[in-house]
Curated annotation (Swiss-Prot):
Complex formation: Homodimer.
Entry GO MF terms: oxidoreductase activity, acting on the CH-OH group of donors, NAD or NADP as acceptor; ubiquitin binding
Keyword NAD carried by entry: yes
Family of this protein: In the N-terminal section; belongs to the ubiquitin-conjugating enzyme family. UEV subfamily. In the C-terminal section; belongs to the LDH/MDH superfamily.
Species the sequence originates in: Homo sapiens (Human)
Highest taxon, organism lineage: Eukaryota
Protein's name according to its UniProt entry: Ubiquitin-conjugating enzyme E2 variant 3
Protein backbone atom coordinates (compact mmCIF):
# COMPACT_ATOMS: atom_id res chain seq x y z
CA UNK A 1 0.00 0.00 0.00
CA UNK A 2 1.38 3.40 -1.00
CA UNK A 3 2.14 5.61 1.97
CA UNK A 4 0.14 8.87 1.78
CA UNK A 5 2.59 11.24 3.42
CA UNK A 6 0.68 14.45 2.69
CA UNK A 7 -2.65 12.99 3.71
CA UNK A 8 -1.12 11.94 7.01
CA UNK A 9 0.31 15.43 7.56
CA UNK A 10 -3.17 16.89 7.18
CA UNK A 11 -4.59 14.41 9.69
CA UNK A 12 -1.87 15.34 12.18
CA UNK A 13 -2.47 19.09 11.99
CA UNK A 14 -2.83 19.43 15.79
CA UNK A 15 0.06 17.11 16.72
CA UNK A 16 2.97 18.77 18.50
CA UNK A 17 5.67 16.88 16.60
CA UNK A 18 3.94 16.16 13.31
CA UNK A 19 7.02 15.81 11.12
CA UNK A 20 8.73 13.39 13.53
CA UNK A 21 5.55 11.32 13.72
CA UNK A 22 5.08 11.21 9.93
CA UNK A 23 8.70 10.19 9.42
CA UNK A 24 8.39 7.35 11.93
CA UNK A 25 5.14 6.09 10.41
CA UNK A 26 6.80 6.13 6.98
CA UNK A 27 9.36 3.71 8.42
CA UNK A 28 6.57 1.56 9.91
CA UNK A 29 5.02 1.35 6.44
CA UNK A 30 8.26 -0.11 5.04
CA UNK A 31 7.98 -3.11 7.38
CA UNK A 32 4.18 -3.31 7.70
CA UNK A 33 2.65 -1.81 4.54
CA UNK A 34 -0.82 -3.29 5.18
CA UNK A 35 -1.61 -1.13 8.24
CA UNK A 36 -4.59 1.19 7.77
CA UNK A 37 -4.56 4.70 9.29
CA UNK A 38 -7.50 6.80 10.47
CA UNK A 39 -8.41 9.63 12.84
CA UNK A 40 -10.87 8.57 15.57
CA UNK A 41 -11.96 9.58 19.06
CA UNK A 42 -10.18 7.94 21.99
CA UNK A 43 -11.88 7.90 25.42
CA UNK A 44 -9.45 8.15 28.35
CA UNK A 45 -9.95 6.75 31.87
CA UNK A 46 -11.27 10.09 33.15
CA UNK A 47 -13.91 10.04 30.36
CA UNK A 48 -12.19 12.86 28.49
CA UNK A 49 -11.99 12.42 24.72
CA UNK A 50 -9.46 13.32 22.07
CA UNK A 51 -9.19 12.80 18.32
CA UNK A 52 -6.11 10.65 17.78
CA UNK A 53 -4.41 8.97 14.87
CA UNK A 54 -4.64 5.20 15.04
CA UNK A 55 -3.72 2.32 12.81
CA UNK A 56 -4.98 -1.24 12.57
CA UNK A 57 -3.70 -4.42 11.01
CA UNK A 58 -2.27 -7.81 11.87
CA UNK A 59 1.13 -8.99 13.01
CA UNK A 60 2.46 -12.50 12.26
CA UNK A 61 3.10 -14.62 15.35
CA UNK A 62 4.66 -18.09 15.17
CA UNK A 63 3.37 -20.27 18.00
CA UNK A 64 4.07 -23.98 18.37
CA UNK A 65 4.84 -24.35 14.68
CA UNK A 66 1.80 -22.44 13.43
CA UNK A 67 1.58 -18.83 12.20
CA UNK A 68 -1.24 -16.67 13.56
CA UNK A 69 -2.16 -13.21 12.29
CA UNK A 70 -2.91 -11.27 15.48
CA UNK A 71 -5.13 -8.19 14.92
CA UNK A 72 -3.93 -5.06 16.73
CA UNK A 73 -4.75 -1.37 17.05
CA UNK A 74 -2.25 1.36 17.96
CA UNK A 75 -3.35 4.80 19.17
CA UNK A 76 -0.74 7.52 18.60
CA UNK A 77 -0.83 10.28 21.22
CA UNK A 78 -0.45 13.91 20.14
CA UNK A 79 2.83 14.07 22.09
CA UNK A 80 4.37 11.24 20.01
CA UNK A 81 7.24 10.28 19.72
CA UNK A 82 7.92 11.45 23.29
CA UNK A 83 5.01 9.40 24.66
CA UNK A 84 4.40 5.72 23.83
CA UNK A 85 1.42 4.51 21.79
CA UNK A 86 -1.60 2.95 23.49
CA UNK A 87 -1.93 -0.58 22.17
CA UNK A 88 -4.88 -2.97 22.01
CA UNK A 89 -5.76 -6.31 20.53
CA UNK A 90 -8.59 -6.01 18.01
CA UNK A 91 -10.43 -9.34 18.21
CA UNK A 92 -12.99 -10.41 15.66
CA UNK A 93 -16.32 -11.99 16.61
CA UNK A 94 -14.81 -15.49 16.73
CA UNK A 95 -11.73 -14.56 18.81
CA UNK A 96 -11.36 -14.46 22.59
CA UNK A 97 -8.68 -12.71 24.64
CA UNK A 98 -6.25 -14.73 26.73
CA UNK A 99 -5.50 -12.55 29.75
CA UNK A 100 -1.81 -12.84 30.62
CA UNK A 101 1.32 -11.00 31.67
CA UNK A 102 1.05 -8.63 28.73
CA UNK A 103 -2.70 -8.41 28.01
CA UNK A 104 -5.66 -7.45 30.20
CA UNK A 105 -9.30 -8.48 29.90
CA UNK A 106 -10.11 -5.54 27.62
CA UNK A 107 -7.28 -6.39 25.24
CA UNK A 108 -4.93 -3.59 26.29
CA UNK A 109 -1.30 -4.56 25.74
CA UNK A 110 1.44 -4.00 28.34
CA UNK A 111 5.09 -4.51 27.38
CA UNK A 112 8.49 -3.58 28.85
CA UNK A 113 9.16 -1.63 25.64
CA UNK A 114 6.16 0.60 26.38
CA UNK A 115 7.13 1.02 30.02
CA UNK A 116 10.68 2.06 29.12
CA UNK A 117 9.73 4.19 26.11
CA UNK A 118 12.29 6.93 25.51
CA UNK A 119 12.71 8.97 22.33
CA UNK A 120 14.74 8.61 20.10
CA UNK A 121 15.83 5.06 20.94
CA UNK A 122 12.23 3.78 21.19
CA UNK A 123 10.37 3.41 17.89
CA UNK A 124 7.13 1.75 16.80
CA UNK A 125 8.90 -0.87 14.66
CA UNK A 126 10.94 -1.93 17.69
CA UNK A 127 7.75 -2.06 19.77
CA UNK A 128 6.03 -4.32 17.23
CA UNK A 129 9.04 -6.63 17.10
CA UNK A 130 8.96 -7.02 20.90
CA UNK A 131 5.19 -7.56 20.73
CA UNK A 132 5.67 -10.40 18.25
CA UNK A 133 8.40 -11.94 20.43
CA UNK A 134 6.26 -11.80 23.60
CA UNK A 135 3.18 -13.18 21.83
CA UNK A 136 5.29 -16.08 20.54
CA UNK A 137 5.93 -16.98 24.18
CA UNK A 138 2.31 -16.50 25.27
CA UNK A 139 -0.37 -16.37 22.60
CA UNK A 140 -2.83 -13.53 23.42
CA UNK A 141 -5.95 -14.87 21.67
CA UNK A 142 -7.90 -18.08 21.12
CA UNK A 143 -10.74 -19.27 18.88
CA UNK A 144 -14.19 -19.10 20.42
CA UNK A 145 -16.63 -21.95 20.24
CA UNK A 146 -19.89 -21.22 18.44
CA UNK A 147 -21.71 -20.94 21.78
CA UNK A 148 -19.27 -18.25 22.96
CA UNK A 149 -19.43 -16.09 19.84
CA UNK A 150 -22.71 -14.42 20.82
CA UNK A 151 -21.24 -13.29 24.13
CA UNK A 152 -18.25 -11.81 22.30
CA UNK A 153 -20.47 -8.97 21.08
CA UNK A 154 -20.31 -7.31 24.54
CA UNK A 155 -16.52 -7.26 24.55
CA UNK A 156 -16.30 -5.92 21.02
CA UNK A 157 -18.73 -3.12 21.90
CA UNK A 158 -16.67 -2.37 24.99
CA UNK A 159 -13.40 -2.17 23.04
CA UNK A 160 -15.09 0.00 20.43
CA UNK A 161 -15.86 2.56 23.14
CA UNK A 162 -12.26 2.40 24.44
CA UNK A 163 -13.19 2.61 28.09
CA UNK A 164 -11.41 0.69 30.81
CA UNK A 165 -13.66 -0.76 33.47
CA UNK A 166 -13.28 -4.22 34.96
CA UNK A 167 -14.62 -7.10 32.91
CA UNK A 168 -13.80 -10.74 32.38
CA UNK A 169 -15.96 -11.16 29.28
CA UNK A 170 -14.60 -14.05 27.16
CA UNK A 171 -11.18 -13.86 28.78
CA UNK A 172 -9.17 -16.58 30.45
CA UNK A 173 -7.53 -15.52 33.68
CA UNK A 174 -3.86 -16.06 34.40
CA UNK A 175 -1.78 -17.47 37.29
CA UNK A 176 -3.70 -16.92 40.51
CA UNK A 177 -1.51 -19.30 42.48
CA UNK A 178 0.87 -16.59 43.74
CA UNK A 179 -2.02 -14.60 45.20
CA UNK A 180 -2.91 -17.04 47.98
CA UNK A 181 -0.59 -16.63 50.93
CA UNK A 182 2.51 -14.72 49.87
CA UNK A 183 3.00 -11.24 51.33
CA UNK A 184 4.50 -9.69 48.22
CA UNK A 185 5.30 -5.96 48.23
CA UNK A 186 6.49 -3.84 45.30
CA UNK A 187 8.35 -0.54 45.61
CA UNK A 188 8.31 1.56 42.42
CA UNK A 189 11.38 3.76 42.06
CA UNK A 190 15.08 3.22 42.73
CA UNK A 191 15.84 6.66 44.18
CA UNK A 192 16.68 7.46 47.80
CA UNK A 193 13.08 7.12 48.97
CA UNK A 194 12.56 3.84 47.11
CA UNK A 195 15.73 2.42 48.66
CA UNK A 196 14.68 3.67 52.12
CA UNK A 197 11.27 2.00 51.80
CA UNK A 198 12.87 -1.24 50.61
CA UNK A 199 15.33 -1.34 53.50
CA UNK A 200 12.69 -0.46 56.11
CA UNK A 201 10.22 -3.08 54.86
CA UNK A 202 12.99 -5.66 54.69
CA UNK A 203 14.13 -4.83 58.24
CA UNK A 204 10.60 -5.28 59.63
CA UNK A 205 10.31 -8.69 57.99
CA UNK A 206 6.90 -7.86 56.56
CA UNK A 207 7.34 -9.26 53.05
CA UNK A 208 7.88 -12.82 51.88
CA UNK A 209 8.87 -11.28 48.56
CA UNK A 210 9.93 -7.67 48.03
CA UNK A 211 10.33 -6.28 44.51
CA UNK A 212 12.14 -2.99 43.82
CA UNK A 213 11.33 -1.64 40.37
CA UNK A 214 14.28 0.52 39.35
CA UNK A 215 13.05 2.45 36.32
CA UNK A 216 16.19 4.57 35.89
CA UNK A 217 18.76 3.96 33.19
CA UNK A 218 22.20 2.55 33.91
CA UNK A 219 23.65 1.94 37.37
CA UNK A 220 22.52 4.53 39.91
CA UNK A 221 24.62 3.38 42.85
CA UNK A 222 22.15 2.35 45.52
CA UNK A 223 20.24 -0.32 43.60
CA UNK A 224 23.53 -1.67 42.32
CA UNK A 225 24.73 -1.93 45.93
CA UNK A 226 21.56 -3.83 46.86
CA UNK A 227 22.29 -6.30 44.07
CA UNK A 228 25.91 -6.67 45.18
CA UNK A 229 25.11 -7.29 48.84
CA UNK A 230 21.98 -9.36 48.17
CA UNK A 231 19.23 -8.73 50.74
CA UNK A 232 17.13 -11.83 51.40
CA UNK A 233 13.78 -11.97 49.56
CA UNK A 234 14.55 -8.74 47.64
CA UNK A 235 14.35 -8.76 43.84
CA UNK A 236 15.47 -5.79 41.73
CA UNK A 237 13.87 -5.51 38.31
CA UNK A 238 13.07 -3.12 35.47
CA UNK A 239 10.13 -5.23 34.25
CA UNK A 240 6.78 -4.09 35.65
CA UNK A 241 5.41 -7.62 35.34
CA UNK A 242 7.77 -8.62 38.19
CA UNK A 243 5.28 -6.85 40.48
CA UNK A 244 2.46 -9.31 39.68
CA UNK A 245 0.23 -10.35 42.59
CA UNK A 246 1.61 -7.79 45.05
CA UNK A 247 -0.50 -6.99 48.11
CA UNK A 248 0.84 -3.44 48.26
CA UNK A 249 2.40 -1.36 45.47
CA UNK A 250 4.31 1.71 46.72
CA UNK A 251 4.95 4.64 44.37
CA UNK A 252 8.10 6.65 45.20
CA UNK A 253 8.99 7.92 41.72
CA UNK A 254 9.09 11.60 40.83
CA UNK A 255 9.81 13.17 37.46
CA UNK A 256 12.91 15.35 37.43
CA UNK A 257 11.80 17.55 34.56
CA UNK A 258 13.35 20.95 33.93
CA UNK A 259 9.99 22.72 33.55
CA UNK A 260 9.76 26.17 35.09
CA UNK A 261 6.17 26.25 36.33
CA UNK A 262 4.81 24.17 39.20
CA UNK A 263 1.94 23.00 36.98
CA UNK A 264 4.41 21.71 34.37
CA UNK A 265 6.37 19.82 37.02
CA UNK A 266 3.21 18.15 38.35
CA UNK A 267 2.05 17.39 34.79
CA UNK A 268 5.37 15.65 34.08
CA UNK A 269 4.70 13.43 37.09
CA UNK A 270 1.20 12.74 35.79
CA UNK A 271 2.60 11.80 32.37
CA UNK A 272 4.95 9.32 34.02
CA UNK A 273 2.11 7.83 36.09
CA UNK A 274 -0.01 7.40 32.94
CA UNK A 275 2.54 4.85 31.75
CA UNK A 276 2.94 3.13 35.13
CA UNK A 277 -0.34 2.98 37.01
CA UNK A 278 -2.57 1.10 34.52
CA UNK A 279 0.10 -1.57 34.00
CA UNK A 280 0.85 -2.01 37.70
CA UNK A 281 -2.86 -2.09 38.46
CA UNK A 282 -3.27 -4.80 35.83
CA UNK A 283 -0.52 -6.95 37.34
CA UNK A 284 -1.84 -6.60 40.92
CA UNK A 285 -5.58 -6.14 40.60
CA UNK A 286 -6.37 -6.73 44.28
CA UNK A 287 -3.54 -4.67 45.74
CA UNK A 288 -3.50 -1.52 47.84
CA UNK A 289 -1.73 1.35 46.04
CA UNK A 290 0.32 3.50 48.44
CA UNK A 291 1.58 6.81 47.03
CA UNK A 292 4.68 8.55 48.37
CA UNK A 293 5.37 10.62 45.23
CA UNK A 294 4.97 14.39 45.47
CA UNK A 295 2.74 16.33 45.70
CA UNK A 296 1.20 13.40 47.52
CA UNK A 297 -2.41 14.61 47.61
CA UNK A 298 -2.53 15.22 43.86
CA UNK A 299 -0.55 12.13 42.87
CA UNK A 300 -2.82 9.96 45.03
CA UNK A 301 -5.82 11.40 43.18
CA UNK A 302 -4.08 10.77 39.84
CA UNK A 303 -3.29 7.17 40.85
CA UNK A 304 -6.92 6.63 41.87
CA UNK A 305 -8.23 7.93 38.55
CA UNK A 306 -5.71 6.05 36.39
CA UNK A 307 -6.08 2.76 38.26
CA UNK A 308 -9.91 2.78 38.46
CA UNK A 309 -9.45 1.06 41.85
CA UNK A 310 -12.00 1.76 44.61
CA UNK A 311 -10.95 4.77 46.70
CA UNK A 312 -10.33 2.70 49.84
CA UNK A 313 -7.49 0.85 48.06
CA UNK A 314 -5.64 4.00 46.94
CA UNK A 315 -3.98 6.00 49.71
CA UNK A 316 -1.13 8.46 50.12
CA UNK A 317 1.47 8.69 52.88
CA UNK A 318 -0.19 11.92 54.01
CA UNK A 319 0.72 13.17 57.47
CA UNK A 320 1.41 9.75 59.01
CA UNK A 321 5.02 10.58 59.86
CA UNK A 322 4.10 13.93 61.45
CA UNK A 323 1.27 12.31 63.41
CA UNK A 324 3.45 9.54 64.79
CA UNK A 325 6.14 12.05 65.73
CA UNK A 326 3.61 14.36 67.37
CA UNK A 327 2.13 11.54 69.44
CA UNK A 328 5.62 10.51 70.55
CA UNK A 329 6.55 14.10 71.50
CA UNK A 330 3.39 14.59 73.58
CA UNK A 331 3.81 11.30 75.44
CA UNK A 332 7.58 10.94 75.79
CA UNK A 333 9.03 14.46 75.53
CA UNK A 334 6.32 16.62 77.12
CA UNK A 335 5.31 13.79 79.51
CA UNK A 336 1.62 14.64 79.14
CA UNK A 337 -0.98 12.65 81.08
CA UNK A 338 -2.34 11.13 77.88
CA UNK A 339 -1.32 8.35 75.53
CA UNK A 340 -0.89 10.88 72.74
CA UNK A 341 -3.00 8.66 70.48
CA UNK A 342 -5.87 11.17 70.55
CA UNK A 343 -3.99 13.80 68.53
CA UNK A 344 -3.49 13.82 64.77
CA UNK A 345 -1.90 15.92 62.07
CA UNK A 346 -4.35 16.06 59.17
CA UNK A 347 -5.00 17.90 55.92
CA UNK A 348 -2.37 18.82 53.37
CA UNK A 349 1.30 17.94 53.71
CA UNK A 350 3.56 20.92 54.40
CA UNK A 351 2.77 24.30 55.91
CA UNK A 352 -1.01 23.89 55.57
CA UNK A 353 -1.30 20.80 57.77
CA UNK A 354 -3.50 21.14 60.87
CA UNK A 355 -3.69 19.44 64.25
CA UNK A 356 -6.83 17.87 65.70
CA UNK A 357 -7.96 15.57 68.52
CA UNK A 358 -10.04 12.43 68.01
CA UNK A 359 -13.02 13.27 70.20
CA UNK A 360 -11.74 12.21 73.63
CA UNK A 361 -12.28 15.53 75.38
CA UNK A 362 -12.49 13.86 78.78
CA UNK A 363 -8.87 12.70 78.51
CA UNK A 364 -7.38 16.17 78.18
CA UNK A 365 -9.19 19.48 78.72
CA UNK A 366 -9.52 21.85 75.78
CA UNK A 367 -7.08 24.31 77.39
CA UNK A 368 -4.53 21.55 77.91
CA UNK A 369 -5.07 20.38 74.35
CA UNK A 370 -4.22 23.83 73.00
CA UNK A 371 -1.13 24.17 75.21
CA UNK A 372 0.12 20.69 74.37
CA UNK A 373 -0.58 21.20 70.68
CA UNK A 374 1.33 24.47 70.49
CA UNK A 375 4.37 23.12 72.34
CA UNK A 376 4.41 19.87 70.38
CA UNK A 377 4.07 21.62 67.02
CA UNK A 378 7.04 23.86 67.85
CA UNK A 379 9.15 20.76 68.48
CA UNK A 380 7.78 19.07 65.37
CA UNK A 381 8.69 21.97 63.07
CA UNK A 382 12.42 21.42 63.60
CA UNK A 383 12.13 17.85 62.32
CA UNK A 384 12.74 17.31 58.62
CA UNK A 385 11.35 14.55 56.44
CA UNK A 386 14.44 12.59 55.47
CA UNK A 387 14.05 9.67 53.09
CA UNK A 388 14.86 7.13 55.79
CA UNK A 389 12.23 8.65 58.11
CA UNK A 390 9.58 8.47 55.41
CA UNK A 391 10.71 4.92 54.62
CA UNK A 392 10.14 3.86 58.24
CA UNK A 393 6.69 5.48 58.17
CA UNK A 394 5.82 3.69 54.92
CA UNK A 395 6.95 0.35 56.36
CA UNK A 396 4.69 0.89 59.37
CA UNK A 397 1.68 1.52 57.11
CA UNK A 398 2.50 -1.51 54.96
CA UNK A 399 2.69 -3.64 58.12
CA UNK A 400 -0.81 -2.50 59.10
CA UNK A 401 -2.14 -3.35 55.64
CA UNK A 402 -0.62 -6.77 54.92
CA UNK A 403 -1.12 -8.01 58.49
CA UNK A 404 -4.63 -6.50 58.75
CA UNK A 405 -3.76 -4.77 62.04
CA UNK A 406 -6.69 -2.31 61.93
CA UNK A 407 -4.33 0.38 63.20
CA UNK A 408 -5.13 4.09 62.81
CA UNK A 409 -2.85 6.14 60.54
CA UNK A 410 -3.18 9.68 59.20
CA UNK A 411 -3.09 8.96 55.46
CA UNK A 412 -4.21 10.71 52.28
CA UNK A 413 -7.73 9.41 51.66
CA UNK A 414 -10.65 10.60 49.58
CA UNK A 415 -11.95 13.55 51.62
CA UNK A 416 -15.21 14.12 49.74
CA UNK A 417 -18.06 14.09 52.25
CA UNK A 418 -15.91 15.05 55.24
CA UNK A 419 -15.69 18.56 56.76
CA UNK A 420 -18.17 19.82 54.13
CA UNK A 421 -15.72 19.05 51.32
CA UNK A 422 -17.64 18.38 48.11
CA UNK A 423 -14.83 17.87 45.58
CA UNK A 424 -12.85 14.73 44.77
CA UNK A 425 -9.62 15.52 46.60
CA UNK A 426 -7.34 13.49 48.85
CA UNK A 427 -6.37 14.90 52.26
CA UNK A 428 -4.71 13.25 55.23
CA UNK A 429 -7.31 11.92 57.67
CA UNK A 430 -7.09 9.41 60.55
CA UNK A 431 -7.99 6.08 58.95
CA UNK A 432 -8.10 2.47 60.09
CA UNK A 433 -5.88 0.46 57.75
CA UNK A 434 -6.24 -3.23 56.96
CA UNK A 435 -6.03 -5.72 54.12
CA UNK A 436 -8.32 -3.69 51.85
CA UNK A 437 -6.72 -0.34 52.61
CA UNK A 438 -8.97 2.14 54.41
CA UNK A 439 -11.72 0.35 56.33
CA UNK A 440 -12.93 3.42 58.25
CA UNK A 441 -12.23 7.14 58.60
CA UNK A 442 -12.07 8.25 62.25
CA UNK A 443 -14.12 11.30 63.18
CA UNK A 444 -12.16 14.04 64.91
CA UNK A 445 -13.26 16.97 67.05
CA UNK A 446 -12.71 20.35 65.40
CA UNK A 447 -13.46 22.99 68.02
CA UNK A 448 -12.18 25.87 65.90
CA UNK A 449 -13.86 26.97 62.69
CA UNK A 450 -10.43 28.03 61.39
CA UNK A 451 -9.35 24.37 61.24
CA UNK A 452 -12.31 23.40 59.08
CA UNK A 453 -11.75 26.48 56.94
CA UNK A 454 -8.11 25.51 56.45
CA UNK A 455 -9.08 22.01 55.33
CA UNK A 456 -11.64 23.44 52.92
CA UNK A 457 -9.08 25.95 51.62
CA UNK A 458 -6.59 23.14 50.99
CA UNK A 459 -9.27 21.12 49.24
CA UNK A 460 -10.17 24.08 47.04
CA UNK A 461 -6.58 24.82 45.97
CA UNK A 462 -5.84 21.13 45.31
CA UNK A 463 -9.03 20.72 43.28
CA UNK A 464 -8.19 23.82 41.25
CA UNK A 465 -4.79 22.42 40.28
CA UNK A 466 -6.26 18.99 39.50
CA UNK A 467 -8.66 20.61 37.04
CA UNK A 468 -5.68 21.90 35.05
CA UNK A 469 -3.99 18.50 34.72
CA UNK A 470 -4.31 16.27 31.67
CA UNK A 471 -4.92 12.66 32.68
Amino acid sequence: MEFDCEGLRRLLGKYKFRDLTVEELRNVNVFFPHFKYSMDTYVFKDSSQKDLLNFTGTIPVMYQGNTYNIPIRFWILDSHPFAPPICFLKPTANMGILVGKHVDAQGRIYLPYLQNWSHPKSVIVGLIKEMIAKFQEELPMYSLSSSDEARQVDLLAYIAKITEGVSDTNSKSWANHENKTVNKITVVGGGELGIACTLAISAKGIADRLVLLDLSEGTKGATMDLEIFNLPNVEISKDLSASAHSKVVIFTVNSLGSSQSYLDVVQSNVDMFRALVPALGHYSQHSVLLVASQPVEIMTYVTWKLSTFPANRVIGIGCNLDSQRLQYIITNVLKAQTSGKEVWVIGEQGEDKVLTWSGQEEVVSHTSQVQLSNRAMELLRVKGQRSWSVGLSVADMVDSIVNNKKKVHSVSALAKGYYDINSEVFLSLPCILGTNGVSEVIKTTLKEDTVTEKLQSSASSIHSLQQQLKL
